[in-house]
From Swiss-Prot:
Residues 40-294 form the CoA carboxyltransferase C-terminal domain. This is Acetyl-coenzyme A carboxylase carboxyl transferase subunit alpha. PROSITE patterns: COA_CT_CTER (PS50989). GO terms for biological process: fatty acid biosynthetic process; malonyl-CoA biosynthetic process. Acetyl-CoA carboxylase is a heterohexamer composed of biotin carboxyl carrier protein (AccB), biotin carboxylase (AccC) and two subunits each of ACCase subunit alpha (AccA) and ACCase subunit beta (AccD). It catalyses: N(6)-carboxybiotinyl-L-lysyl-[protein] + acetyl-CoA = N(6)-biotinyl-L-lysyl-[protein] + malonyl-CoA. Pathway: Lipid metabolism; malonyl-CoA biosynthesis; malonyl-CoA from acetyl-CoA: step 1/1. Belongs to the AccA family. Component of the acetyl coenzyme A carboxylase (ACC) complex. First, biotin carboxylase catalyzes the carboxylation of biotin on its carrier protein (BCCP) and then the CO(2) group is transferred by the carboxyltransferase to acetyl-CoA to form malonyl-CoA. The lineage of its organism: Bacteria, Bacillati, Cyanobacteriota, Cyanophyceae, Synechococcales. It comes from Prochlorococcus marinus (strain MIT 9301). Pfam families: ACCA (PF03255). GO terms for molecular function: acetyl-CoA carboxylase activity; ATP binding; carboxyl- or carbamoyltransferase activity. It is found in: Cytoplasm.
């Protein structure tokens, strides 16, 4: 098993993890029965981990969402089905590896699964562009969704990106147009769409595959109009204000559920999905099946109409005389 990567706020667990590893090595190298000591230490570590994760700040949740060992789109696909066939290419000369898709089945029901894909190490992240899709990636996604629409396949999307790639070439090749076209076309698809934020849900890069009948989020995932670092740099000219920006942006599942932006917050195992990926997979699979079963009973016209209404009610119109009230809610920079 790969060595666990602990986040900075998990430091109280470091010593316990070392002791657990030492006892496991002792058990492997000798015939000494250490099962009781191991059980006690693992129980203590689990209790402390649960205490830590019960009170995470939005900024800490971002760290969990970006955890390098957090289950990715491909991890969930492999948990859900063993007959998945990846489909490649945008039919315009490109095959973006940051956004993948293919056909598989869940409980003998054929579905299209597509999502952002990050790497596990530097080499993989270079290939996957750190999960930041280029215009070709969104065009590939649209091609696959149109294929699913043609063959009446429900669509499952997995969102995990800091945002769409913002390089010069991406802009020259129509990044904004590619995402906007996806938004427009997804509103008209006649098949159920269930989207899940499995890690980071960043800006337009997330929205490009996020127009769905049901939008789910894991407990420690985040969904935001801009990264807190970018927001802090814009508002306060100071990236160090990212924790304050994270709180102001309302990026957590709890906040977004209250605002009516998402439909369900999925619980995570103690310590986050990276501690028990299979448990996370079971939770997600059950939720997807529940929502798909409900959506498949709806007539096509009603499905499209409800999807349209879902997004039309988002946001709030505020009269000009209330602008000061809005600004008063934004944390101000202190000297």
């Amino acid at each position: 098993m790969a060595k666990r990567y602990l986040l900075d706020f998990e430091k109280p667990l470091v010593e316990l993890e070392k002791q657990i590893e030492q006892i496991k090595e002792l058990a492997r190298d000798s015939e000494v029965d250490v099962s009781q000591q191991l059980l006690q230490l693992e129980t203590l570590a689990a209790r402390r981990r649960e205490e830590i994760f019960k009170s995470l700040t939005p900024a800490q949740k971002i760290q969990v969402a970006r955890h390098p060992q957090r289950p990715s789109t491909l991890d969930f696909v492999q948990m859900f089905c063993d007959d998945w066939i990846e489909l490649h290419g945008d039919r315009n000369g490109g095959d973006d590896m940051a956004l993948i898709g293919g056909i598989g089945s869940i409980n003998n029901r054929p579905v299209l699964m597509l999502g952002h894909q990050k790497g596990r190490d530097t080499k993989e992240n270079v290939v996957r562009n750190f999960g930041m899709a280029k215009p070709g990636g969104y065009r590939k996604a649209l091609r696959l969704m149109q294929h699913a629409n043609r063959f009446s396949l429900p669509i499952l999307t997995f969102i995990d990106t800091p945002g769409a790639y913002a390089g010069l070439k991406a802009e020259e090749h129509g990044q904004g147009e590619a995402i906007a076209r996806n938004l427009r076309e997804m509103f008209g698809l006649k098949v159920p769409i269930v989207a899940t934020v499995i890690g980071e849900g960043g800006s337009g890069g997330a929205l490009g595959i996020g127009v769905a009948d049901r939008l789910l989020m894991f407990e420690h995932s985040v969904y935001t109009v801009a990264s807190p670092e970018a927001c802090a740099s814009i508002l306060w000219r100071d990236a160090a204000k990212a924790p304050e920006a994270a709180s102001a942006l309302k990026i957590t599942g709890k906040d977004l559920l209250k605002l009516g932006i998402i439909d369900e917050v999925l619980p995570e195992p103690s310590g986050g999905n990276n501690w028990a990926p299979l448990d996370a997979g079971n939770t997600l699979k059950e939720a997807i099946e529940k929502h798909l079963n409900a959506l498949l009973k709806m007539p096509e016209d009603e499905l499209i109409e409800e999807r349209y209404k879902k997004f039309r009610v988002l946001g709030k119109f505020i009269e000009a005389n209330n602008i000061e009230e809005i600004y008063s809610e934004i944390p101000q920079k202190t000297e």
